[in-house]
């Protein structure tokens, strides 16, 4: 056996980077998780807009974060610590293929912060304004927070405040750096764009607008939990560490603590939210259990390597327990229409869980650390509020933050994108179909209630109760109870009242409509 | 180059634990797989209840398995083998962060057994009774099975029976320890809770109640198959083994056999079920092909490292071929309404595949092994039947196993959780809406057929054909063909018969109803 | 510390094969990605058929590829290169468990090519004909392409053409070997089976038939992107390479380049398609952004380790930009009804991205390489066209390529499989329900517009507007506006016009129908 003439660092690199690549892919997979969580909580007529915003967060975000964002974080780290900075060095990663795995690992965290925001402003924000914000949060707002913390800036042990206090800010995987940043930015956006039409009654009372598919929201939640194992446990990026003596050390205990506390926090958050929603609403609510599971995860995300297992369980339970009350406060007191409750789930749970790390720390309580935690939460929140408000205001000035009332009623899918996501179930269908006119060629059954005119060429059956005019060329069955006029050119002898007496198997229409 | 002064164990730990962590995350991802598989096979009015039960299995299950379950398994292992046991040692993992990755790896298997059960008892079991069972199967019923087998107890080589026979029970990744345990417990629950209303005709003939989305069921199946690669191949947890001579050995052949037999078993199971369902129903059925794919996976899960590749192909095909006949036997002979066929997919395929391991063993046939396999299947099944019956009976006594007939008809989403999962497509919507009264504020189009009264404030269009009374304050369009009374307070001059002649674009209502 | 007496190859094997196994699982997960992408783009009445074809691609495909396909590739490699071949050696993997992980790694690429085809021929191809093609592409058509390229054949550096030109064909992860092969085969199939009824108007103008769920299509896209990280980065299968000096080298730069170019290509493709679709249709279209994301990925899949990061960005953007124009050309000029645009996404983007590798090569431009790239694209496309045409023609001769017009109108779910995927939303339900007669026993709300007769025993509410006759035995509410006859045997006193005045809460039926 040839004595192994290898550098232990190489072995460690091999193991560590297989781990880092796989967890980066898992964290990317949180993008469809967030898209489903949000799509499920909006009405069918706005699902396409949600999908568009979530794809844009990622597609545009990675380009911006590569060309600008990652460099800005390093510069801010240097600016807010004695270390100083060098612009060329800050952007050196762009030409260094050896740095590109680390860049991807950083990018998937940045994109997570960005995609949280869309959940708060859904169903009424202008798509162009949103794109401006998505580019800015990935190019500037989030990178500043990353600079202040993970890139050695102000709040880190080597930053001005960290050096002054003698302790660095603890937020292991981004409960505040990523989630609170996204949650607070979302709250600011929801406030500035205003509530959806009908969300609050005349006297300001909350009138919930249920999403079109709780199934999608819970599926999104469980996909997020799957990706979150990459988010939390993956941030323990060192599996094999090289020791001073030239050997290797397996970081099993650290990995184990992060994996366990993530699991217990998730479980406790979901169970706590089940209990609290039963208390609030009389019955355990699946959507609140899902939000509790997420809030439990957010609450422990900053704490996972730092706290005891029972501390993680308590923090998770706390996150899950406060998510519904925090949402109610957002809606009933602040009167802010945060559609997916992102402030409650990501903002409040992230802040509370990260501030309380010292209370449950494995190494015991430290008042200084508590001071730093509270200061860190405050500084990140303040920066995010100010920066988001400025960017939303600017985007609003250029494009207008909100779509028109008419478009909001019709749905952003048609208004912003000219599409219907579920043409056979609800609403208009297909880009060729202008508003009001609908050339259904899909053989699907139409239940029309919008007065639009149908041009049917696909044998699909129509139940018309809205006075719209049909042009039938396909022998499909028409049932008219609405006085609408039928124009049939499919060989049917059109009797009175829209009854096609020959080919099509039409029932009597009792609507007195004229048919040619 | 510094000669590597490292302990080969450390290198092996690094490689092996990256593998164990990633496969644990994959096995967790089977939770949404099971949730979709079940949600797709129930009616829309019960999907929220399915999601709630699946989230509870995991969230509550991990807490119970950490505090109780894992320790119980070790104790049972000691109790049923000459080894004896020590309670403190059995629960020592709780305080040992070095043991927490292994705990998570065990927990994801336990949670898989628990979540299978809900598929059998869907659409009529009381949620509180179910929660009791979920806690007990993760805290006691499954851990006993784990103790008897994987934790060195009765059936293992070191257990009383194993020592007596001179062979240990073979079930590599849990075809019976996990899947048959879940499938049998599900059958017991389905039997004790009774069939769904309308499932059997007056003369006991089967009247299938189709699920609301075969797409979700097949998507769940393919997510399960993705996680199953972690379930099976991950159970070959040692990638690099340390040899006696202090070197390392790559377990490529063992990993390769498990990966190949898993793939061929899956494929053969699906193809066999396609052929059998064509034979049974005249046409190849996608849902039975999906169930065959799962049954093929279950059938090889215990066998994967032990059998030849063609043996795995045969076992998989056998699993896929018997799943439909086993389901028909469950329904037509046992008259048990096992909604998702969990007994056929997980119970029967698991038992048959694991019992027949010796027939296809790489090392050749062993009668003693066959005796142990059959004994093992019998003991695990018997324990599961008795324990499940006792727990279901106890839960039934405290809470009643079954929801009321009225609630079953209305749907468990509203009855147990006060929600509707697809408000724009079917049924009630939102927690504020008591049964019968519906304050639709979502702008969605309502097709009301339940006589409930509508309070509309969101401009959504109503097609009322059920005599319910509308209170409209939003200019939305009403089409009344049912004599229902409209109360319009949105500036519309309410003409006779519910025609709002000004703002709202209402068509003539020909229903003679009174409108104020 | 014992000096490590290990073979560096073993350490490298451990690390590399954990990586290869995990990425193989990720690539398998692209199967449900493709299934959702396709299911979302067809009508509800054909979703079951899409699911069936996608499950069959995988289940049958892995069996065929194990028994035949992988061996054929090796033989073709030997046949088209000076190396020659040996049949026994070509199929030696079948008995060698040490080769089975590599086999699985190859199989998941083969299955990807197969499943792309079904997206083009959806909604009208006979299922048996499709199964014949699925078996042939996995057993012969794709393996020949693999042989010509990755298995050392004609186009590789050691192949006849490669040796002649002095350069081997570059297609790192299969932009053309897998994707263009699938896309071209799909185009041939779509051409030979003919367009869907109603897809083109009388004068040949395009009449889009929108899919039933853009949400599923975008979810499928993002699942594909998740698996694609395994597809591209996983093809850099060596994480730790053993050096000549007996040491190990970490391939970080190679892995980093593939990971970065994959990410930038994906992002640029999506953003480019968003811009182009806005230009074409006036508004940014979510489905085209999703297709652009995929086309961006395809375009860089062959190029990822070979090109600069900005080259990857340009290739991705190019792929995303040409996908809509390529689709329009397919439809408007070629008049081919490629339902999911697989030729545009996988064929055109794959060809263009791979042909242009030399233009953006890290090592600089090479005219010879460009010649090889163009020749390779041409040879693969030509082989695929000829072979696919022959197989589709043969399958058509035996089974007929196309389902009947009546079946196409009714939907392939019922015609080919006897099922309805969304019974509560649209269409017939359950295998027991022959066409026209429907024994709804699911308590679901029926909106019947097809004149079929209902036998209701489950309390579900009916809105009948189609003259069909109801037999009610369950107290469910009936609303009749269609003159249909009600036969009520549930204790209701059936008044005139179908009004059950006692138990069932029926509204007045104004249809003059006779009720007993």
Swiss-Prot record, chains A, B, C:
Record keyword Transmembrane helix present: yes
Pfam families named in the record: Ammonium_transp
GO molecular function, one term: ammonium channel activity
Region Disordered, annotated ranges: 426-516
Induction: Highly expressed during ammonium starvation under nitrate-rich conditions.
Biased composition (Basic and acidic residues): 445-491
One CC-aspect GO term: plasma membrane
Location within or outside the cell: Cell membrane
Main localization category: membrane
Chain positions of site Twin-His motif. Important for optimum substrate conductance: 179, 346
InterPro entries found in the cross-reference section: Ammonium/urea_transptr, NH4_transpt_AmtB-like_dom
Taxonomy, superkingdom: Archaea
Membrane topology: Multi-pass membrane protein
Keywords recorded for this protein, A-Z: Ammonia transport, Cell membrane, Membrane, Transmembrane, Transmembrane helix, Transport
Gene Ontology biological process terms from the UniProt entry: ammonium homeostasis
Stretches that traverse the bilayer: 17-37, 59-79, 101-121, 130-150, 170-190, 214-234, 258-278, 286-306, 307-327, 342-362, 374-394
Family classification: Belongs to the ammonia transporter channel (TC 1.A.11.2) family.
Subunit-level organization: Homotrimer. Interacts with both GlnK1 and GlnK2 after ammonium shock. Interaction is rapid, reversible and dependent on nitrogen source.
Function, in words: Involved in the uptake of ammonium/ammonia (NH(4)(+)/NH(3)). Transport is electrogenic.
Protein name, entry field: Ammonium transporter Amt1
